[in-house]
A protein has these predicted regions:
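Conserved ABC ATPase "signature" region
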Residues: 107-126
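The feature captures the beta-strand-to-loop junction immediately N-terminal to the Walker
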Residues: 39-41
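Helix-to-loop junction immediately C-terminal to a conserved catalytic motif
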Residues: 54
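Short beta-strand immediately N-terminal to the Walker A/P-loop
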Residues: 36-37, 80
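Short helical segment in ABC ATPase nucleotide-binding domains corresponding to the A-loop/adjacent helical element
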Residues: 94-102, 112, 116
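Conserved ABC transporter NBD signature motif
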Residues: 62-73
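Beta-to-alpha transition at the N-cap of a short helix in the ABC ATPase nucleotide-binding domain
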Residues: 77, 83, 92-94, 99
Length: 126
């Protein structure tokens, strides 16, 4: 069993009063620190699976666990990076970056140096 484990995941939506199967018996194990890529055509269920793993949607049947805990809702200790940038417009760039550090419980006094490092790395310091 992986750090992230998907077992017999099934997801249906209702469309025009009929069930539409998006995920069918999906099984997947991802080890901690492992990098994977989900590939498939548009509409094949990639985003639905990721939303279920993140806890934004529940599977119709089957189970998803992270570090042995069943996923039933989004968890503050896990950070999701969205395809469409989801910056909080009332926060600065630095403050948006700090959200991830807060969720990982990085000490407040260490955050400015970390933020500065990555802002410079991606060229946002100009």
């Amino acid at each position: 069993m992986g750090y992230i484990s998907v077992r017999n995941a099934h997801k249906e939506f209702m469309k025009d009063g009929e069930p539409l199967t998006i995920l069918e018996d999906v099984n997947l194990d991802i080890e901690k620190g492992e990098f994977i890529c989900l590939l498939g055509p548009s509409g094949s269920g990639k985003s639905t699976l990721l939303n279920a793993i993140a806890g934004f949607e529940l599977v119709t049947s089957g189970s998803i666990t992270i570090d042995g805990e069943e996923v039933k809702a989004p968890q503050l200790r896990y950070v999701t990076v969205f395809q469409n940038y989801g910056l909080l417009p009332w926060r600065t760039v630095e403050s948006n970056i700090e959200l991830g550090l807060e969720s990982k419980k990085v000490p407040k006094e260490e955050r400015p140096a970390i933020i500065d490092k990555y802002v410079k790395m991606v060229g946002l310091d100009h």
